[in-house]
């Protein structure tokens, strides 16, 4: 991290200004630049091309050095479109890697890969900037204690708990509630942990990025009236950007998150949507640089690139970065090198189910498909582990019986199976929960449910103490006391209707 004396955009000093090169070759987003002997820039240095194109329009393209080719040539990848660039144009070596603004000034704003605001809300304070290329924290700085990151979302905390400083894969198609779940997590970390969030939109649709921004403003995650009170910073490098920008936008978002962890000593949530696009962009850049492709056409450096990003996402003694990464699985093939490399880094998976979403059960997290390495008795305790296992067993038995119920009906089941089905249906409904960020749509006030309350609620359902209550009493409530109160209200209403 460095502190700049002025608030203007990073200025190239007169000393560095002397290190000028010339464009020798342009192939799409890749430039070859010739520098004077002995003045070669370092790998990952930012190069700036300024000038005018043939019709007199201003050009300002930032590139990143990727290879030193010999004969005083370097190969660089552009972070924006190379339209209008010509051979012979002057290139300035900035003498440092790309640096982006960090700190409280980034909250509530949208940035591109270069750390420039793109939301038309004026300039951002750039007195404090940080280079996007950093080494992962040293082993001695890490906090190796295994601790649960409580989200206040029942289904997540009970069945697939997140690790503080861990990495979670979020799997789900379009329209099953990924965005709402992401916004609820941003809201809950701000309220319960005093933390902030950084959202990295990597190679996804611009429309989705715009929708997310609008929904965040609507739900109060971004405070329009007082931007500084917002809980999230957004960094976008969408599908229409060159591969260089899509490859580096994840690092820009991570750099902003690292500042909140290391300097502000906060718990940070880092969202990456989509981690597959990071790999895809790396593959494009690798091909453009002329590297020999590896398995399925991916870059030979796939594991290294993924590792250098993922190893920076961790808990230190100052704070933590907990990362939630949306994972696109190409052609639903889990053995594809991109998702397979990602899985090696994940501590938990949250799988969203279209079947549950169709039933109106939100969050539509699949209780049987979602997993977590944290769900072990020595980490979460015997009580939590036992409750989670019994919930899964009951849900699994219900799933097995559904075919029989569809063909023969509920009456043909044994007494024991009928009881299992009744409890499983209550559990399914109790796994739903009203969200704070969905209040504006549903009219139901949001609920944050602590882990102890969650465990108590499911224990009561499994023990049979609540067998007499109607299953709709468990739908979209917070803790179990609300379910019993709702059951009483339903009883009163039914008596009045009679």
Curated annotation (Swiss-Prot):
<keyword id="KW-0406">Ion transport</keyword>
<comment type="similarity">
    <text>Belongs to the ATPase alpha/beta chains family.</text>
</comment>
<comment type="function">
    <text>Produces ATP from ADP in the presence of a proton gradient across the membrane. The catalytic sites are hosted primarily by the beta subunits.</text>
</comment>
<dbReference type="InterPro" id="IPR024034">
    <property type="entry name" value="ATPase_F1/V1_b/a_C"/>
</dbReference>
<keyword id="KW-0813">Transport</keyword>
<dbReference type="Pfam" id="PF02874">
    <property type="entry name" value="ATP-synt_ab_N"/>
</dbReference>
<dbReference type="Pfam" id="PF22919">
    <property type="entry name" value="ATP-synt_VA_C"/>
</dbReference>
<comment type="subunit">
    <text>F-type ATPases have 2 components, CF(1) - the catalytic core - and CF(0) - the membrane proton channel. CF(1) has five subunits: alpha(3), beta(3), gamma(1), delta(1), epsilon(1). CF(0) has four main subunits: a(1), b(1), b'(1) and c(9-12).</text>
</comment>
<dbReference type="InterPro" id="IPR020003">
    <property type="entry name" value="ATPase_a/bsu_AS"/>
</dbReference>
<keyword id="KW-0066">ATP synthesis</keyword>
<dbReference type="GO" id="GO:0042776">
    <property type="term" value="P:proton motive force-driven mitochondrial ATP synthesis"/>
</dbReference>
<dbReference type="InterPro" id="IPR000194">
    <property type="entry name" value="ATPase_F1/V1/A1_a/bsu_nucl-bd"/>
</dbReference>
<dbReference type="GO" id="GO:0045259">
    <property type="term" value="C:proton-transporting ATP synthase complex"/>
</dbReference>
<keyword id="KW-0067">ATP-binding</keyword>
<keyword id="KW-0150">Chloroplast</keyword>
<dbReference type="InterPro" id="IPR003593">
    <property type="entry name" value="AAA+_ATPase"/>
</dbReference>
<keyword id="KW-0547">Nucleotide-binding</keyword>
<dbReference type="GO" id="GO:0046933">
    <property type="term" value="F:proton-transporting ATP synthase activity, rotational mechanism"/>
</dbReference>
<dbReference type="InterPro" id="IPR036121">
    <property type="entry name" value="ATPase_F1/V1/A1_a/bsu_N_sf"/>
</dbReference>
<keyword id="KW-0472">Membrane</keyword>
<dbReference type="GO" id="GO:0005524">
    <property type="term" value="F:ATP binding"/>
</dbReference>
<feature type="binding site">
    <location>
        <begin position="172"/>
        <end position="179"/>
    </location>
    <ligand>
        <name>ATP</name>
    </ligand>
</feature>
<dbReference type="GO" id="GO:0009535">
    <property type="term" value="C:chloroplast thylakoid membrane"/>
</dbReference>
<keyword id="KW-0139">CF(1)</keyword>
<dbReference type="InterPro" id="IPR050053">
    <property type="entry name" value="ATPase_alpha/beta_chains"/>
</dbReference>
<protein>
    <recommendedName>
        <fullName>ATP synthase subunit beta, chloroplastic</fullName>
        <ecNumber>7.1.2.2</ecNumber>
    </recommendedName>
</protein>
<keyword id="KW-0793">Thylakoid</keyword>
<keyword id="KW-1278">Translocase</keyword>
<dbReference type="InterPro" id="IPR005722">
    <property type="entry name" value="ATP_synth_F1_bsu"/>
</dbReference>
<keyword id="KW-0375">Hydrogen ion transport</keyword>
<dbReference type="GO" id="GO:0005739">
    <property type="term" value="C:mitochondrion"/>
</dbReference>
<dbReference type="InterPro" id="IPR027417">
    <property type="entry name" value="P-loop_NTPase"/>
</dbReference>
<keyword id="KW-0934">Plastid</keyword>
<dbReference type="InterPro" id="IPR004100">
    <property type="entry name" value="ATPase_F1/V1/A1_a/bsu_N"/>
</dbReference>
<dbReference type="GO" id="GO:0016887">
    <property type="term" value="F:ATP hydrolysis activity"/>
</dbReference>
<dbReference type="InterPro" id="IPR055190">
    <property type="entry name" value="ATP-synt_VA_C"/>
</dbReference>
<dbReference type="Pfam" id="PF00006">
    <property type="entry name" value="ATP-synt_ab"/>
</dbReference>
